[in-house]
Amino acid sequence: MAAKIRRDDEVIVLTGKDKGKRGKVKNVLSSGKVIVEGINLVKKHQKPVPALNQPGGIVEKEAAIQISNLAIFNAATGKADRVGFRFEDGKKVRFFKSNSETIK
């Protein structure tokens, strides 16, 4: 099945502590989760690694978030949108349901 949300898509968070925030998809995981830039930040306690000259401490990084909690952002309407699929010139492409505009 083709993915409705892919890497480098601009998405908006629908639910949770980051509701309403927008970000760019960095990575799509096979478990139905994605990692979004600047969204779902968690603090990790990291031990120092002297061999690699890495200091220890508390590091903030992005955690995975469920795809169902995200929607693709339509820049033309300025809102979250749903994604559909259609064939154009023999290729399967994604489009916004609200205005039928093809997604890059």
From Swiss-Prot:
Name of the coding gene:
rplX
**Extent of the signal sequence:** none
What is the role of the protein in this entry? Answer: One of two assembly initiator proteins, it binds directly to the 5'-end of the 23S rRNA, where it nucleates assembly of the 50S subunit.
| PROSITE patterns the record matches | RIBOSOMAL_L24
Origin species, per record, is Klebsiella pneumoniae (strain 342)
Family matches, as InterPro entries: KOW, Rib_uL2_dom2, Ribosomal_uL24, Ribosomal_uL24_CS, Ribosomal_uL24_KOW, Translation_prot_SH3-like_sf
Name which cysteines form disulfide bonds. none
Molecular functions per Gene Ontology: rRNA binding; structural constituent of ribosome
One of the Pfam families matching this protein, by short name: KOW
Q: What is this protein called?
A: Large ribosomal subunit protein uL24
Which family is this protein grouped under?
Belongs to the universal ribosomal protein uL24 family.
Subunit details: Part of the 50S ribosomal subunit.
Q: Which NCBIfam families match?
A: rplX_bact (TIGR01079)
Q: Which GO terms describe its biological process?
A: translation
